[in-house]
């Protein structure tokens, strides 16, 4: 008869902590040396269009969407009016207002954001952290935005609750052609 030794409680605690921190970490975006640094107030004024997908980390199910963003910069505040059209027919509008607080740092508000969003330049990328109220739940977003050599912008986000990743978003944006 064999007996197994139960795992030590500290080992289990350490394992859980490492799993939670791995799930909650922000996504990485590969940036080539030829890609220019991202400056929000330079990229977003005017019209930007994009396609994205939210992927549920537990089920693997996906929800695709298109977005049209109309941006304006008044020298201090970047306003982004986002019109979403989901593949299932739902439409939604959100409006970001980012205020530059120092070179490369911003604070932002949106109608569904709890408190203020925080954005900052890190190398050639911009990182954005915020909490969103979704149907009675508050979930955390950690976005990384980076320009590509072709002028498109890649936005990858991790969505989490209590430090556990529940989903991810990948969105590719391009400036709309001038009419």
Describe the role of every protein-language-model region:
Residues 2-12:
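Bacterial N-terminal signal peptides that target proteins for export
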Residues 32-47:
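N-terminal helix-cap/turn-to-beta initiation motif at the start of protein domains
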Residues 51-134, 138-142, 176:
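Central antiparallel beta-sheet cores of small beta-barrel/beta-sandwich binding domains
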Residues 28-30:
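Extracellular beta-rich ligand/substrate-recognition surface
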Residues 44-52, 155:
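A short, Trp-centered hydrophobic/proline-enriched beta-strand micro-motif
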Residues 142-154, 158-179:
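Edge beta-strand at a domain terminus
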Residues 24-26:
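Bacterial signal peptide processing site
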Residues 19-22:
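C-terminal motif of bacterial Sec signal peptides marking the signal peptidase cleavage site
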């Amino acid at each position: 008869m064999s007996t197994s030794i139960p795992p030590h409680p500290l080992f289990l605690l350490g394992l859980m902590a490492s799993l939670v921190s791995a799930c909650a970490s922000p996504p990485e975006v590969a940036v080539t040396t030829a890609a220019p640094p991202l400056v929000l107030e330079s990229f977003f004024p005017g019209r930007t269009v994009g396609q994205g997908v939210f992927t549920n980390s537990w089920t693997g199910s996906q929800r695709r969407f298109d977005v049209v963003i109309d941006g304006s910069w008044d020298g201090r505040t970047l306003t982004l009016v986002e019109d979403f059209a989901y593949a299932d027919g739902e439409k939604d509008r959100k409006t970001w207002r980012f205020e530059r607080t120092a070179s490369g740092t911003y604070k932002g508000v949106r109608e569904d954001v709890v408190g203020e969003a925080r954005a900052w330049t890190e190398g050639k990328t911009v990182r954005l952290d915020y909490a969103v109220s979704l149907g009675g739940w508050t979930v955390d977003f950690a976005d990384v935005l980076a320009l590509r050599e072709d002028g498109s912008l890649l936005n990858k986000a991790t969505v989490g609750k209590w430090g556990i990743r529940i989903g991810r978003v990948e969105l590719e944006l391009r400036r709309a052609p001038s009419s």
